[in-house]
Amino acid sequence: MSALRVHVDGIGLFGPGMAGWTLAREVLTGQAPFELATVQLPPVNALPPAERRRVGVAIKLAMATGFEAARHAGADAAQLNTVFSSTGGDCDNCHNILETLASSDRAVSPTRFHNSVHNAPAGYWSIATGCMAASTSLCAFDATFAAGLLEATVQAVSTGQPCLLIAFDTAYPEPLYALRQIPYAMGVGLLLNPHKTAASCASLSIEPSSAVATPMDDPALEDLRQRIPAARSLPLLQRLARGGTGSVVIDYLGAPNLAIEVTP
């Protein structure tokens, strides 16, 4: 595979101790200390009240990161192709459905069943934005962020149109947590453009690599990177926060990983 090249027009990030890209950028550049805290999400005011009442953390997280990336770029969310990438989707919802099925009353809530499909966030996004552009939902276990980045990049390059990547993960409650130990919710949004614009803050050149993934210097951030699939993005986000030129390797399938050259 030859290198793929796109430009980053917008960034969104909500995770533990990083409520939005502005605060996250300060943490990632060392201007502010990283303090572990539960992710704080804004209300999803773009959804009608009935839908707003039905959504859980996963959809709120996807909405928050997507809208922040679009705002950062000054882009119209209603016009953007999207890629939603999540290793487990709505884990709380999955837990509740399984709990119901294990009980004497096995009647699953229609709303919970509706929200259990992997592309539910894409559906709520279309309701919130009125977007009728193409949307893809995928997962790839621990390689989910890299798989989403590749998919969004290929779509941007092949269509000649911007593509918004929304990668997010949430935590399973026990007993499922014992089998899939994602400790915190985290979401990342990247608006990728095949053309350099006034909104572009960096350019990415992406290609396969046999090199090992770039670790985070901060032990607490490295712990997040290793334990949350969406946090495999942190070395790239840190490079973007610092500005200038540099390269990182992010986890993909191990052989290969993805090498990313970042330039202004």
Q: Which stretches of residues belong to each language-model region?
A:
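Conserved "HGTGT" condensation-loop signature of ketosynthase/thiolase-family condensing enzymes
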Residues: 1-112, 117-134, 167-264
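Active-site-proximal alpha-helical scaffold in enzymes
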Residues: 62-67, 72, 137-163
